[in-house]
């Protein structure tokens, strides 16, 4: 296990195949939200490869992002790849009031996971005092950023049936769900983009 300390208001950590973007949120103690991002290279352009007389034996490796050399000639991925395509992104944030940092980092997310500490409208004052978000505030953020789907989580222990509030929450954002432990979702690349 390698620990990495977040030392800025926003910080990006790159790993093999994805990156983690941490961003500061607004809670009573230091707290961060996160976006997990898988970037996606552009499509392989066979015509460009042939035009530039790039040996076929290198095509696959160039598609994977390698830079290669043969007989003093350097071959780079940008020689054969088109414009970067839309990847995948999941943004997650709890223990916070609504913030601009959430809105900025949730742009383009395929799945937005936010706290819905309170479902009762009369708990807004309590949410503000304790630096949490209501389900309705989370739904408003999802609507503002154009998220395709919102999972609410991090409920108050006093809220035993969060799904009871979903009809009202969906009036703000129709694709909102009261998430449960163990939920999974398969995200796929959009082949049209």
Language-model region placement:
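Short acidic, glycine/proline-enriched helix-loop-strand junctions
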Residues: 160-183
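Positions that flank functional sites
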Residues: 121, 157-158, 184
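Metal-dependent phosphodiesterase/nuclease catalytic metal-binding core
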Residues: 7-152, 161-167, 189-193
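A short helix-to-beta-strand connector/capping loop
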Residues: 1-2, 15-16, 87-88, 172-175
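General small-molecule cofactor/ligand-binding pocket signal
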Residues: 1-7, 21-23, 177-179
